[in-house]
Amino acid sequence: MGGYRTDDEYDYLFKLVLIGDSGVGKSNLLSRFTKNEFNLESKSTIGVEFATKTLNVDAKVVKAQIWDTAGQERYRAITSAYYRGAVGALLVYDVTRRATFENAARWLKELRDHTDPNIVVMLIGNKSDLRHLVAVPTEDGKSFAERESLYFMETSALEATNVENAFTEVLTQIYRIVSKRAVEAGDSGSSSGLPSKGQTINVKEDSSVLKRFGCCST
């Protein structure tokens, strides 16, 4: 679990959610990003867990609160609370298991049903280190991401490949949305300016400034 920071230690708090089938590596992506750890013996998450990490984005201190849940159907009852307030998501599939990729569309629909439809989403093909077992070509992931206006990266939590890049890209894009909103508010004569220090950001409140982003990959 990431360390808790008081309100005066960060400028923005962004809630991210990890979604995708059970066993695709969501928990290991989370632990790699927040603690730089990887557990080969990790078991499926039961219920909901979250961790935090604070980083600098364009000279602002951003605290990411990242939620992780099990992919099994028996945990569907937590859906609404899990998604509430999320401004970014990482949709994860396992590049060695075709079915997990085919289920990505269902996960994306559920996400958009419970959040602003323009939420910043990164499609992640995890376990890229298992090159000899790949069942989902990179081009398939790119095509789906382009079709749905998602970002896209292939990652390896085991080898720490692109893990930090994926989370950081999502957080940076959320921050840019918030910054654009603040600039537009200033241009219109609003006195609100930037959100107050430590404020939790809910992009849904200002969906008019959101744009669908094109696919990016490494």
UniProtKB/Swiss-Prot annotation:
Lipidation sites (S-geranylgeranyl cysteine): 215-216
GO molecular function: GTP binding; GTPase activity
Keywords carried by this UniProt record: Cell membrane, GTP-binding, Lipoprotein, Membrane, Nucleotide-binding, Prenylation
SUPFAM superfamilies assigned: P-loop containing nucleoside triphosphate hydrolases
Topology in the lipid bilayer: Lipid-anchor
Motif interval(s): Effector region: 42-50
Subcellular location: Cell membrane
Keyword Membrane tagged: yes
Pfam families referenced in this protein's UniProt entry, alphabetically: Ras
CC terms in the record's Gene Ontology section: plasma membrane
Domain of life: Eukaryota
Residues annotated as binding GTP: 20-27, 68-72, 126-129
Family membership: Belongs to the small GTPase superfamily. Rab family.
The protein, known as: Ras-related protein Rab11D
Originating gene: RAB11D
